[in-house]
Swiss-Prot record:
SUPFAM superfamilies: Metalloproteases ('zincins'), catalytic domain
Modified residues (N6-acetyllysine): K124
CC per GO annotation: mitochondrial matrix; mitochondrion
Protein known as: Mitochondrial intermediate peptidase
Keyword Transmembrane helix in record: no
Function field: Cleaves proteins, imported into the mitochondrion, to their mature size.
Keywords for this protein: Acetylation, Calcium, Cobalt, Hydrolase, Iron, Magnesium, Manganese, Metal-binding, Metalloprotease, Mitochondrion, Protease, Transit peptide, Zinc
Record flagged with keyword Transit peptide: yes
Residues annotated as catalytic: E494
Catalytic activity: Release of an N-terminal octapeptide as second stage of processing of some proteins imported into the mitochondrion
GO biological process: proteolysis
EC number: 3.4.24.59
Residue stretch of the organelle transit peptide: 1-33
Native organism: Mus musculus
């Protein structure tokens, strides 16, 4: 399946001028005149967007510089050109003798489809113009239809099979080419192309059914529930939107200070919906049928092939050991929260599932006096971008420059385009920063691959292009965009993904950048969170936007310590979700209903009681995009923690460690087995116990001592 590896992952310095950064630019890349279009990155983000003269009068380029996409109709042209080229490449693949050229042709075929599909995948949700969104949606459907045809093209499959079946020829290929060939074959076989015609037809039908069920389930996860006003006490009704004689419950209201509001929202929002329950059951059983049809014992076995964990047994071992190590800490967290609830609400002091987010926040605020608004003046967006610039420059020799955009290149006038430039290698790629709030914009922070990097036949390198989407407030006339500590951490997180895309400079776009196993893809982004919480890094950029005063060390220390409050209970909740995901995608038919399984798993892996007549699993949207892989965030965090402690804790600006990180981890994208990359970075092969210990030990870090030692 040629688009399988293209799945998106469902989170700053002026002075050292462009001349120094461009000194190493040679050959063709120097022909482009860059000196007049690059500017310091911090300044570009601390000013309100303007309709610049060059933007109004300059050459019209189309979205992302694609000439056809200056109008919505251009998507039709782009997809027709892609489909025409696809047919030609299929003929080439089928007529070329088996060898390395086979893999190159397959990768070009994948690139041809992904360049339209990935771009359209972003535009269909990110563009403010409905005409562009609809045209992009149609392009996605058109490319998807072509992919289905290729998935059932036996001649194309056999051309790859001839290569993989020749042991001597495979041994002559380099490791990356072998892996990419095997990944293409894996993508084919999970769609059932190796089966007889009847089973192949069943596999195609199941794939279509799973896609439809996934879309239906995902859509309903956010549907509000209604209840008659008369059924709720009058004094809490104003917390909910009204619809005539009904109240609309559209979420859990987890931060509401009134216990009764949280309880009502929890019980009503999570009340079972029969259609959604049936949809989930059909989705899980269809996934299981497809997995068995193509040769796997469970969907989880199929989904975990090629990951760090490799098998469901390893995942459950990881989750069980982590749960065991967390259990005592979690009990203490729950006891502390119950004490706070008793203090504030003596009449109803039992801790319930709707309580932890609120009471952990109360404890955090009381103990550390963390008021986000006190931090914001020190964290202007421009300052944070300069901080990233300093960090990337010291660690990797990379500088970010703001680059002018042409008319039609961006979808909103507040988009910033960054050129990512290495001190000796030159231009590495582009990051489009869609950072600011606007109507109908998706609320989740995301990283999108628009174009993957690859080595082209003429010897030049196709530069990667990505979009980072955040939801930050706009600058005003009086002050720039100011970030809360949480926003700043999210910015660093998403920039971790972007750097992975820029530095995962593989020969093949099928494995470029973040196109890697899910439990490895979050490692670079989570690692950036550790940098964002280190005072030595923060002190480089966190200065008051008016006075220039640095953010006091004590404030950073308090913030970091506050993040450890109730972290065991929060992580225990994630373990519960991950275990539930594994059980749902394990042996079928399921022994009990999904709700009974939820109740048992919650009792085993969480500790707070199941609430009768609720079905939280029907709101678990990650079952669609992260089916059997929800554990990935925990495992990625464990790996990132180990890398931080082993390589960057002593010196977060260590250039040798930064270069090793690039060489061993980022450079391979998905072109190398993830455990081999981790082993190369850590100089050892970590065990499940090592992963568990890394996560638990994070809760012990004495940041106060650490900051004092770093003077």
């Amino acid at each position: 399946m040629l688009l399988a590896a293209g799945a998106r992952y469902a989170r700053r310095l002026c002075g050292r001028g462009a001349a120094a950064a461009l000194q190493g630019r040679t050959g063709r890349s120097c022909a482009r005149d860059v000196s007049t279009s690059w500017s310091p990155v911090g300044a570009a983000f601390n000013v309100k967007p303007q309709s610049h003269l060059w933007n109004l009068l300059g050459e019209r380029r189309g979205l992302f510089g694609v000439p056809e996409l200056s109008t919505p109709e251009g998507f039709q042209v782009a997809q027709e050109e892609a489909l025409k080229k696809t047919e030609w490449l299929v003929e080439r693949a089928c007529s070329t003798p088996p060898g390395p050229q086979t893999v190159l042709i397959f990768d070009e075929l994948s690139d041809c489809l992904c360049r339209v599909a990935d771009l359209a995948d972003f535009v269909k949700i990110g563009h403010p113009d409905p005409a562009f969104r609809e045209a992009a949606q149609e392009a996605c459907r058109s490319i998807g239809t072509m992919v289905e045809k290729l998935n059932t093209n036996v001649e194309l499959y056999q051309s790859l099979q001839r290569l993989l079946g020749d042991k001597k020829l495979m041994e002559s290929l380099d490791a990356e080419t072998r892996r990419v060939a095997e990944l293409f074959m894996f993508d084919f076989e999970i769609s059932g192309i190796h089966l007889d015609e009847e089973k192949r037809r069943r596999a195609v039908d199941l794939n279509v059914k799973i896609l439809d069920l996934s879309n239906a389930f995902l859509m309903r996860t956010n549907f509000p529930n209604k209840i008659r006003k008369s059924l709720l006490p009058e004094h809490i009704q104003h917390h909910f939107a009204r619809d005539g004689s009904h109240l609309i419950i559209d979420g859990l209201h987890a931060e509401a200070s009134d216990d009764l509001v949280r309880e009502a929202a929890y019980k009503i929002f999570l009340y079972p919906n029969a259609d959604q329950l049936k949809c989930l059951e059909e989705l899980l059983s269809s996934r299981d049928l497809l997995a068995k049809l193509v040769g796997y014992s469970t969907f989880s076995h199929r989904a975990l092939q090629g990951t760090i964990a490799q098998t469901p047994e390893t995942v459950m071992q990881f989750l069980e050991k982590l749960s065991e190590k967390l259990s005592e800490r979690t009990r203490k967290d729950f006891k502390m929260m119950q004490g706070m609830k008793t203090k504030l609400n003596p009449q109803n002091s039992k801790l319930m599932p709707w309580d932890p987010p609120y009471y952990s926040g109360v404890i955090r605020a009381e103990r550390y006096n963390i008021e986000p608004s006190l931090y914001c003046p020190f964290l202007s967006l421009g300052a944070c971008m300069e901080g990233l610039n300093v960090l990337f420059n010291k660690l990797l020799g990379i500088t970010l420059y703001a680059e002018q955009t042409f008319k039609g290149e961006v979808w909103c006038n507040d988009i910033r385009k960054l050129a990512v430039v290495h001190e000796s290698e030159g231009l590495l790629g582009y990051i489009y920063c869609d950072f600011f709030q606007r109507a109908n914009k998706p609320q989740q922070d995301c990283h999108f691959t628009i174009r993957g990097g690859r080595l082209k036949e003429d010897g030049s390198y196709q530069l990667p292009v990505v979009v980072l989407m955040l939801n930050l407030p706009h600058a005003s006339r009086d002050f720039p965009t100011l970030l809360t500590p949480g926003m700043m951490e999210n910015l660093f997180h998403e920039m971790g993904h972007a750097m992975h895309s820029m530095l995962g400079r593989t020969r093949y776009q099928h494995v470029t950048g973040t196109r890697c196993p899910t439990d490895f893809a979050e490692v670079p982004s989570i690692l950036m969170e550790y940098f964002s919480n280190d005072y030595r890094v923060v002190s480089q950029f966190a200065k008051h936007y008016q006075t220039g005063q640095p953010l006091p060390k004590a404030m950073v220390s308090r913030l970091c310590e506050s993040k450890k409050v109730c972290t065991a209970a929060e992580m225990q909740l994630q373990v519960f979700y991950a275990a539930l995901d594994q059980i749902y995608h394990g042996q079928h038919p399921l022994k009990k209903s999904t709700t009974d399984i939820l109740m048992e798993t919650q009792e085993q892996f969480y500790g707070l009681p199941y609430v009768p007549d609720t079905a939280w699993q029907l709101r678990f949207s990650h079952l669609v995009g992260y089916g059997a892989k929800y554990y990935s965030y925990l495992m990625s965090r464990a790996v990132a923690s180990m890398i931080w402690k082993e390589c960057f804790l002593q010196d977060p600006f260590n250039r040798a460690a930064g270069e090793r990180y690039r060489r061993e981890m980022l450079a391979h994208g998905g072109g190398k087995e993830p455990m081999l990359m981790i082993q190369g970075m850590l100089q050892k092969c970590p065990s499940i116990d090592d992963f568990v210990d890394a996560l638990v030990s994070d809760m012990n870090l004495d940041f106060e001592t650490f900051f004092l030692d770093s003077k």
